[in-house]
Amino acid sequence: DEEEIIEKTLGVMRKECYLLHNVDILSNCDFESLMYYHQHSPNINATLLVSPRKTSRYLLFNDDNLLCGWVNKDTMETKPAGFRYREGEYQEYAYSGIQVTTPKILHLLPKGKYSIIDFYLSICHRVDIQCYVEDDLQLLDIGKPENLEKAEEFLSKF
């Protein structure tokens, strides 16, 4: 019947999501767990894979694991515009270049070249974007020629 078709369609729409992954990153990410976490998080439009690794630039999440801002600890630059960083008020994580999104996010993406993080920061006040933390996340940036030789060794660990 028509109501059953609508119900099934809405169920598919709620579960539909897309894995976006920087092509020059190798990782030990548990993609199945990441996708499951995203799909079972109501009202979340994007899930960013993050880790507690040391960096100078951190994504900042509130107690509900929702994206609030960004800080460069070397310069104390913050984003988005008007965001005020206060030490100890946020969970600070390094971004991995890996995320899961809903179709809503894909429809909001601007055309042209831009930073995906700047895009997320520009919409985080009106769209729920959460973090998925992998404490033992290992990453290798194979976009750097000197790291290409390390790729085979990196992959052999898994």
Model regions and ranges:
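Alpha-helix N-cap/loop-to-helix initiation residues
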Residues: 2, 27-28
